[in-house]
Curated annotation (Swiss-Prot):
The keyword Secreted applies. It comes from Pogonomyrmex rugosus. Signal peptide: none annotated. The modification Asparagine amide is found at N61. Residues 11-20 have a biased composition (Low complexity). Expressed by the venom gland. Residues 1-34 form a propeptide. Its main location: secreted. This is Myrmicitoxin(1)-Pr2b. It is found in: Secreted. Keywords: Amidation, Ion channel impairing toxin, Neurotoxin, Secreted, Toxin, Voltage-gated sodium channel impairing toxin.
């Protein structure tokens, strides 16, 4: 699997959390008028190491 992430495979809970977070962010951004109160929440979520790692692995470097 070219998308395999050994660190995430070793911690499936972090992987699931990061994936769910990324899906929630994608859904929020897909709204015609994204809810501005969600911005601090998004900033907090992106500050989490597991989320940063997933984003780097799947969006930036992928």
């Amino acid at each position: 699997n070219p998308w395999a992430d050994p660190e995430a495979e070793a911690n499936p809970e972090a992987k699931a959390t990061a994936e769910a977070t990324a899906e929630a962010i994608a859904e929020a951004l897909a709204e015609p008028e994204p809810a501005l109160p969600a911005l601090p929440l998004l900033a907090f979520l992106f500050s989490l190491p597991a989320v940063q790692h997933w984003v780097e692995k799947n969006w930036i470097n992928g």
